[in-house]
Amino acid sequence: MTNILIVEDEQNLARFIELELTHENYTVDIENDGKAGLDKALSKPYDLYILDLMLPNINGLEICRQIRQKTTTPIIIITAKSETYDKVAGLDYGADDYIVKPFDIEELLARIRAVLRRQPDKDVLDINGIIIDKDAFKVTVNGHQLELTKTEYDLLYVLAENRNHVMQREQILDHVWGYNSEVETNVVDVYIRYLRNKLKPFNKEKSIETVRGVGYVIR
């Protein structure tokens, strides 16, 4: 399922876009405030961001800039600003596309399909030379395959799929061991250590960072 975040202060427009996207089987979150939108964007992984420029508290350009510092996820700007310098600024700040309001919803849907097609296949993830092939169920580093248990593999994949997003131990536990698991959160620390030990011969162990008091992130 493709997850999309819309940050748009025109609530009627945001709801209309949400309705159309939901009809196309996308999962949609909406924020009407710039700060809330930025917080949501940086706290949860999405497959696409749709941003207005003129927003309360934090403008869309700043949101675009901060998202682009963290991820290569596609960004589409939708705005009433039609001047060339506005378009140039939006694209220079990291947007993949720029649509001027008012627009036809079919055009927006087509542009969404286009930017999503340009994204690499998520079944193969490349994290600084750590290649994770979901279909083949294998991990290679510098051409060498790592011998991982299923739990180690699942843990690495979850972190990689949420690259640059800090995951709490409880979140990791839910994803890897299951929501009804009675495993304690310190087991996550144990398996992180296992993973780092297996990455150490390739000088990749520091790819998994500890965020003290919170959890882990892979960059």
Curated annotation (Swiss-Prot):
Keywords for this protein: Cytoplasm, DNA-binding, Phosphoprotein, Transcription, Transcription regulation, Two-component regulatory system
Residue numbers of 4-aspartylphosphate PTMs: D52
Gene Ontology molecular function: phosphorelay response regulator activity; transcription cis-regulatory region binding
Ranges of residues in domain Response regulatory: 3-116
Protein name, entry field: Response regulator ArlR
GO BP term, pick one: regulation of DNA-templated transcription
Subcellular locations according to the entry: Cytoplasm
Organism the protein comes from: Staphylococcus epidermidis (strain ATCC 35984 / DSM 28319 / BCRC 17069 / CCUG 31568 / BM 3577 / RP62A)
Coiled coil: none
Keyword set includes Cytoplasm: yes
UniProt PTM: Phosphorylated by ArlS.
A Pfam family matched in the record: Response_reg
